Amino acid sequence: MKPSTKTNVLKDSADNLHDQSIIDTARKVLNIESQAIAELGNRIDDQFVNVVHHLNQCKHLVVTGVGKSGLIGKKISSTFSSIGLPSLFLHASEASHGDLGMISEGDTVIAISNSGETEEIVKLLPVFNRIQCTLVGMTGNMESSLAKQSDYVLDVSVKEE
């Protein structure tokens, strides 16, 4: 068997960096992240309060997304389950292949898409409406299809990723 020819990009990059540049980069990333959190905090408004009240009455929660939004959705779903709100994650790409049966009338769906135009999410919007579930959109684009078709919308936009 041949030895792997893959290179460890992180290791190779770190070997070529000076200790101070590593520290500077880490601090820069943390500053960007903390700024984004502070800005998000400034956007908490009545819509957020309405979502909290709705979730407090919710019997079953489904969280959906694709890619990084999907990974975030998995964590959100897990956290809600941990605090006693029955929740599951539905991968938007898998939904149309038999998984839509997980959603029933009266359920709440949190759909996460930074653009609000993710194809897999947009295709599900009419289905959510037909099932008559409550839709909470989390998006960085308040003019998107997701924002316009959600019962509640949370602005999760960021300046820099």
Q: Which ranges hold each PLM region?
A:
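An N-terminal, well-structured beta->alpha segment
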Residues: 1, 15-59
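Glycine-rich phosphate-binding loops that contact phosphosugars or nucleotide phosphates
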Residues: 60-161
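Short, motif-level signal for alpha-helix interfacial/capping segments enriched in acidic residues
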Residues: 9-15, 130
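N-terminal acidic, proline/glycine-rich, low-complexity intrinsically disordered segments
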Residues: 1-9
